[in-house]
């Protein structure tokens, strides 16, 4: 019997979306794959960080992070309409697809995207699922030798990372529809309602700058952000030590990320959206 523990690695700060009491048995680097159509290849490094041998299996599926109106993010996998348009899960070949790593051992996994000449320019994607479980071949023999009958329980860890395939002229941008504000004594929560523009997801950073009535900046903060389709994203600004009054908040949307190389980003000009708030 196998029990699965699932770690979706989303494009959020620190790339951690779920905290579980168990720890992953293998480490993955990098945690995002970018494939260009002039090479069709990319790779990751998998390392067995546990004290026992690990069986590794790699699979592909389509999915993307989506949000509700409150900005809560979850993975969405059951969208066949978008899968038919944007997915490359059936075009990806992995070498090797199955392997066993001894404790401390590392292995390069190469991902090849087969050419898609009949599809328009833009960014396509899939999720690479790296599943691992401990190899313990002697357990069943030991139970039989001792005359024991029981169910062998194996824990399978699944780590889910994005794979992006860039074909031809990829473009992106944002259409900001509205910014909602929720303010209490300690913080101001901004919820950005926006739709990605162009033929590629918007991967980048939201920078929030807050100015008082004299034009002096009194707060600034930033968070990574991604818009695959129409989304809501949250960003929080501390306000507990600020005086009452009116302020201006400038929200800048940049296609820059510290954890993503500039050559992998689909670039767009900085976009700025300003709102007036009262504390």
Question: Predicted segments — roles?
Answer:
Residues 57-86, 195-214:
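Short acidic, flexible loop segments centered on an aromatic residue
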Residues 114-163, 245-279:
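Terminal connector regions
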Residues 50-52, 117, 196-200, 214, ...:
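Short, acidic/polar linear motifs in exposed loop/turn regions
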Residues 8-18:
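Bacterial N-terminal signal peptides
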Residues 77-117, 216-243:
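Intrinsically disordered, low-complexity Pro/Gly/Ser/Thr-rich segments with frequent PxxP/GP/PP motifs
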Residues 24-54, 59-62, 98, 174-185:
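Beta-sheet-dominated interaction scaffolds and their linkers
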Residues 43-47, 189-197, 238:
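Short edge beta-strand/loop segments characteristic of extracellular beta-sandwich folds
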């Amino acid at each position: 019997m196998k029990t699965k523990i699932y770690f979706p690695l989303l494009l959020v700060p620190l790339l951690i979306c779920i905290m579980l009491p168990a720890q992953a048995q293998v480490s993955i680097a990098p945690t995002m794959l970018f494939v260009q159509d002039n090479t069709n290849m990319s790779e990751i490094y998998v390392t067995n960080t546990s004290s026992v041998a690990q069986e590794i299996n790699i699979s592909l599926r389509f999915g993307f992070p989506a949000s509700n109106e409150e900005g809560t993010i979850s993975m969405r996998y059951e969208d066949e309409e978008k899968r038919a348009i944007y997915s490359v899960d059936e075009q990806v070949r992995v070498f090797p697809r199955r392997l066993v790593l001894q404790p401390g051992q590392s292995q390069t996994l190469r991902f090849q995207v087969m050419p898609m000449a009949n599809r328009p320019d833009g960014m396509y994607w899939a999720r690479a699922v790296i599943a691992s479980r401990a190899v313990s071949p002697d357990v069943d023999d030991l139970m039989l030798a001792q005359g024991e009958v029981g169910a062998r329980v194996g824990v399978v860890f699944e780590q889910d990372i994005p794979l992006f395939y860039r074909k031809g002229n990829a473009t992106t941008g944002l259409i900001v529809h509205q910014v909602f504000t929720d303010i209490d004594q300690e913080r101001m929560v901004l919820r950005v309602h926006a739709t990605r523009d162009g033929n590629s997801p918007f991967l980048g950073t939201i920078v929030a700058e807050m100015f008082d009535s004299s034009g002096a900046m009194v707060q600034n903060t930033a968070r990574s952000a991604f818009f695959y389709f129409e989304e809501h994203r949250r960003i929080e600004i501390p306000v507990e030590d600020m005086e009452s009054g009116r302020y201006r908040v400038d929200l800048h949307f940049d296609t820059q990320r510290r954890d993503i190389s500039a050559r992998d980003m689909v670039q767009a000009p900085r976009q700025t959206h300003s709102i007036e708030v009262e504390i």
